[in-house]
Amino acid sequence: MKRELDYIYIDNCIGCNQDWLPEFDMNRGGCAAVTACDLCMYLARLDKFEDLFKFKNLSRENFIKFAGVMKPYLTPRYHGIDYLEIYLCGLGDYWRSVNYNIRRLEGLAGSASFNFALEAVKSQIDLNLPIPYLMLNHADSKFEDFEWHWFMLAGYDELDDNILVKAVTYGEAAWLDFKALWNTGCERRGGLIKVLNNF
């Protein structure tokens, strides 16, 4: 079974594109803030909560402005936003600043079993909710473009003997082997962020 979210598009790109950001630190290391922008834009539409994204339309210009709003909450740093807790605190602070309490955030560490992660991904997508995902190092070079990077998951495809996830980053989407993605073969791992209902 294949499930894909009705995701946001800007200038024919799926999601926000980090390459559009003019500030050097955000252009090079703003991936956490970019995924937070994606998530807020998506939830503002889904939950009809305009204060999450206080701009009239989805455009490159408004994304750049919104990234500037998000930057103080998820400021790029030397080692990146490399712990789920930093992301949870930063985005949680932004949500509180706009009085968004319809949903809450919860992390699932990369040390969790694949089955737990698979259940989390499927349940989130089945609820029409995208997933911020952090990957640190990976032993398989085919994932090198996703190393030390935050990106979004916006779909899954269950095959007979495998499951693929739809990864969204830099305005593009790619279908990835989720079991291989999750099992990095490295000691330190990232994880994913679940978006849960408060009511």
Predicted ranges, named:
Residues 1-86:
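Active-site-adjacent structural segments surrounding the nucleophilic cysteine of cysteine proteases
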Residues 38, 137-140, 171-172:
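Solvent-exposed loop/turn segments at secondary-structure junctions
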Residues 40, 92-95, 122:
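Non-transmembrane alpha-helical segments in soluble domains
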Residues 45, 93-100, 127-130:
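Alpha-helix capping at helix-to-loop junctions
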Residues 61-117:
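Extracellular-facing segments of soluble proteins and assemblies that are Gly/Ser/Thr-biased and enriched
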Residues 111-165, 198-199:
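Active-site-adjacent substructure of cysteine-protease-like catalytic cores
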Residues 144, 156-199:
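Noncatalytic regulatory segments and standalone regulatory/sensor domains
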